[in-house]
Amino acid sequence: MLRIYAPASSANISVGFDTLGAAISPIDGSLLGDVVQIESISSGFELESAGYFVRKLPKEPQKNIVYQAYVLFSEQLKLRGANVKPLRLTLEKNMPIGSGLGSSACSIVAALVALNQFHNEPFSKMELLEMMGELEGRISGSIHYDNVAPCYLGGVQFMVQSLGNICQKLPFFDNWYWVLAYPGIEVSTAEARAILPKSYTRQNVIAHGRHLGGFVHACHTHQENLAAIMMKDVIAEPYRESLLPNFAEVKQATRDLGALATGISGSGPTIFSIAPDLQTAIKLSSYLESHYLQNNEGFVHVCKVDNEGTREIK
């Protein structure tokens, strides 16, 4: 039996729409992510689901992304002249769906890594990553890697998608704390993408290029202040903030409390605030818990970048 944990991820990081993503884990050691357990059975295939957010999963197993991951893995294995072993997959759904924390990516990545390990790793990391992107595309409507790549590989990943590479790890600031606040409401990725304009002004395109280039340069040259200043979003945030509760007011308040940057995690509704130290992170956590959460489903976690990514757990 294998148990594979895939951590939450925060895509875009304000400045890198569809090109940046970070794997995130709470500093208290709790698991903010999905777990897939895989074990041998005598014949066939079985899928079971458990966990706090299991009630949010599709009722029909064929619509479950873990089932689709199993089917895709089986198809790819057959192309290599091999068959999938009889097995049972159990998804422990610990992540809210439509949260902006890479919930679908967690399930996809954990399932494919579990299947690959269970079959003695017939596929390379790059081949698995391509499968992950394909499955993510089925949910959001377009193939993108800014959740699956950091979730799988850990750290902050920059999507290059050239010269045979899907992504490359970006040096980052280990002393930064990420305060993640999920308000307890759902925003579908497809809905959040549909709200974006089909074209942008030249001014916004130039600003976006300047911010992204400046951010990547600052990461490589260890300039924290410059990196934080460059974390501006002219592509998605101006259009998506209407989907989030009191976003403009909350963003300003977090800045007043000492946040280096605040933005939308993925397509929302989770937001992130970057804190330079633990004391500021605790202040931000307290404020967001009081002013951003909308119901009992919501939560706030003080986190750091998870450099390990998807891994086997006991």
UniProtKB/Swiss-Prot annotation:
Locations listed in the record: Cytoplasm
Transferase found in the keyword field: yes
Broad class of where this protein is predominantly found: cytoplasm
EC annotation from Swiss-Prot or TrEMBL: 2.7.1.39
One of the protein's GO biological processes: threonine biosynthetic process
Domain of life: Bacteria
EC class name: transferase
A UniProt-annotated Pfam family: GHMP_kinases_C
Keywords associated with the record: Amino-acid biosynthesis, ATP-binding, Cytoplasm, Kinase, Nucleotide-binding, Threonine biosynthesis, Transferase
Listed GO CC annotations: cytoplasm
Binding residues for ATP: P96, I97, G98, S99, G100, L101, G102, S103, S104, A105, C106
Pathway the protein contributes to: Amino-acid biosynthesis; L-threonine biosynthesis; L-threonine from L-aspartate: step 4/5
InterPro entries: GHMP_kinase_C_dom, GHMP_kinase_C_sf, GHMP_kinase_N_dom, GHMP_knse_ATP-bd_CS, Homoserine_kinase, Ribosomal_Su5_D2-typ_SF, Ribsml_uS5_D2-typ_fold_subgr
Single GO MF descriptor: ATP binding
Chemical reaction(s) catalysed: L-homoserine + ATP = O-phospho-L-homoserine + ADP + H(+)
Record's function text: Catalyzes the ATP-dependent phosphorylation of L-homoserine to L-homoserine phosphate.
Alphabetical list of HAMAP family matching this protein: Homoser_kinase
Family: Belongs to the GHMP kinase family. Homoserine kinase subfamily.
Record protein name field: Homoserine kinase
